[in-house]
């Protein structure tokens, strides 16, 4: 789609017909805030003409629709959509997301550089522009067992790849502050390049030190106060609205025309059911405006501010010389895409059909011995017990304690007190490690659920109140190469196979969406009250998010950054 300078100049001047002209649209100018009736002329993958009338080899009547720049998701894990990059492309690009900046650390935690290279190769074939941040924390800490370890020397050979922006979210903020040698080696290798942050609840001088290490952007702010401190200290704040982490409403008071040059939008982890039912970045735009944010501020955060934050200077405006990423909307408030152009390509079934393919990686990645019911016993002779407390809609958890008397040497789950057993079993074939504990907040009255989506090490996680059902669900995931399963009374009630690394399906996103509906219904039948129980479960194993978590190595006190005895 790259055209000669001569063609760009001639088509921009109207001396030659443009390759594509969007006629009768109204540009929403993100610099001035004006709505202006005009044609948009496109040559190859570039916009060459605005604020004038043009003729084109192909012309599309926009019928008065509002034209805005393509949306940019500034931080996400494609794997959390539970489909391959190709299906993710087909799922979200028609909604106006023309650029996505991904951190493939989910697949990297399973198969290392092979997973990152898979994303880089896939990105060459997509309709959207998928950019990659190199995964900085694989594993996220020393308190878990992943399928791979990536050091600075592993990442440096990929840093100049044209699809790579920089270093992905640096989750091990305690390691940065402690000047851990491995952390400093990665930061030094990417010094002067874009380094994305991840520092939940980090404040004061500790935050200063973290930022001073060269970290520029951050998406973990969950309150306006936290986000404002990060803005004041020069960070670009990425407002997040995922399937579990829902921070938009809390941060929307900051989404003003004054702050919008330093704010972006991201989804982080969003599954295809939520995308189908509610949307993606388009959902965030609608929601923010409904909550009172000015449309100019919101659309800036969705495109122009995002482009500038990540050094993508060729996009973010509908203007000559910019990448031809254009979304035609019914209204600014409705944000429903009637037409999407991505890099000069009209997004339709033909565009997706014309893509190349890449062979998936990390098959047969669930390497764990058969699980017995007795594996879920929790021995102990002391009643005082740490309990992970779920906060619905948050990935931060509470560090609770409860008196749980052992029975025959086993501290057992108690549905009447909303105390379920949680277990994480190492599944990469490394050491066979296993840890068990308690979680409150699922509301589970019977059965079990299991998942190999278990951030970020992606071991096998199980929650239940019946040990036999927990073993049944875990063993079913061994058989189907990973995924999700719901079990009760000795039967599998629902499942979704995720054979690509135990993370992604090979099925169309519509089928994955339908399977998620069945899984949620089955989980509700167990008494589960959480809207998104599987992603909520996944984040209970992430030891870089306060306050209490569990990995295959034990119960983790995140505030003290240590495994409890």
Swiss-Prot record:
Q: Which residues form a coiled coil?
A: none
Necessary cofactors: Mn(2+)
What Enzyme Commission number does this protein have? 3.5.4.2
Where on the tree of life does the source sit, at the highest rank?
Bacteria
- A Gene Ontology molecular function term of the record: adenine deaminase activity
The protein's matches in NCBIfam families, at most eight in alphabetical order, are given as: ade
GO biological process per UniProt: adenine catabolic process
| Name of this chain's protein | Adenine deaminase
**Keywords, sorted A to Z:** Hydrolase, Manganese
Q: Which reaction does it catalyse?
A: adenine + H2O + H(+) = hypoxanthine + NH4(+)
Tell me which InterPro entries the record gives: Adenine_deam (IPR006679), Adenine_deam_C (IPR026912), Amidohydro-rel (IPR006680), Metal-dep_hydrolase_composite (IPR011059), Metal_Hydrolase (IPR032466)
Task: Show the SUPFAM superfamilies listed in the entry.
Answer: Composite domain of metallo-dependent hydrolases, Metallo-dependent hydrolases
């Amino acid at each position: 789609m790259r055209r000669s300078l001569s063609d760009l100049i001639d088509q921009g001047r109207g001396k030659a017909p443009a390759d594509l002209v969007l006629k009768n649209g109204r540009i929403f100018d993100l610099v001035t805030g004006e709505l202006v009736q005009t044609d948009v002329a496109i040559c190859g993958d570039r916009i060459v003409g605005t604020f004038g009338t043009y003729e084109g080899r192909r012309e599309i009547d926009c019928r008065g629709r509002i034209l805005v720049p393509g949306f940019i998701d500034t931080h996400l894990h494609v794997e959390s959509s539970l489909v391959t990059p190709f299906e993710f492309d087909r799922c979200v690009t028609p909604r106006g997301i023309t650029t996505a900046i991904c951190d493939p650390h989910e697949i990297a935690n399973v198969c290392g550089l092979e997973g990152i290279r898979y994303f880089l190769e896939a990105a060459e074939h997509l309709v959207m522009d998928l950019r990659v941040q190199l995964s900085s924390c694989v594993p996220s800490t020393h308190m878990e067992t992943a399928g791979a370890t990536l050091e600075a020397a592993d990442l440096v050979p990929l840093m100049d790849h044209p699809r790579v922006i920089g270093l992905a979210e640096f989750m091990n903020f305690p390691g940065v502050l402690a000047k851990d040698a491995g952390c400093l080696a990665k930061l030094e290798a990417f010094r002067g390049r874009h380094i994305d942050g991840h520092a939940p609840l980090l404040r004061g001088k500790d935050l200063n030190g973290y930022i001073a290490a060269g970290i520029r952007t951050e998406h973990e702010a969950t309150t306006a106060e936290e986000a404002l401190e990060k803005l004041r200290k020069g960070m670009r704040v990425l407002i997040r609205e995922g399937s579990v982490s829902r921070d938009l409403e809390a941060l929307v008071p900051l989404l003003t025309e004054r702050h919008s040059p330093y704010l972006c939008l991201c989804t982080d982890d969003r599954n295809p059911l939520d995308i189908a039912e509610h949307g993606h970045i388009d959902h965030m735009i609608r929601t923010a405006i409904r909550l009172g944010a000015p449309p100019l501020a919101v659309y800036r955060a969705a495109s122009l501010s995002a482009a500038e934050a990540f050094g993508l200077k060729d996009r973010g405006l509908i203007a000559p010389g910019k990448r031809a990423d254009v979304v035609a909307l019914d209204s600014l408030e409705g944000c429903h895409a009637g037409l999407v152009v991505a890099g000069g390509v009209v997004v339709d079934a033909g565009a997706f059909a014309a893509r190349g393919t890449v062979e998936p990686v990390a098959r047969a990645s669930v390497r764990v011995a058969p699980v017995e019911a007795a594996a879920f016993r929790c021995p102990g002779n002391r009643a005082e017990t740490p309990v992970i407390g779920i906060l619905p809609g948050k990935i931060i958890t509470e560090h609770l304690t409860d008196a749980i008397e052992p029975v025959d040497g086993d501290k057992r789950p108690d549905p009447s007190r909303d105390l379920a057993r949680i277990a994480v079993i190492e599944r990469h074939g490394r050491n066979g490690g296993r840890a068990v504990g308690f979680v409150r907040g699922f509301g589970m009255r019977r059965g079990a659920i299991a998942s190999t989506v278990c951030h970020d090490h992606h071991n096998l996680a199980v929650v239940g109140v019946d040990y036999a059902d927990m073993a049944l669900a875990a063993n079913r995931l061994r058989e189907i190469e990973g995924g999700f399963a719901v079990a009760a009374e000795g039967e599998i009630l629902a499942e979704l196979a995720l054979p690509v690394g135990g993370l992604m399906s090979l099925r169309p996103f519509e089928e994955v969406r339908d399977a998620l509906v069945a899984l949620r219904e089955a989980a509700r039948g167990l008494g589960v009250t959480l809207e998104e129980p599987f992603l909520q479960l996944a984040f209970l194993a992430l030891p870089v998010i306060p306050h209490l978590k569990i990995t295959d190595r034990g119960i983790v006190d995140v505030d003290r950054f240590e495994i409890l005895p």
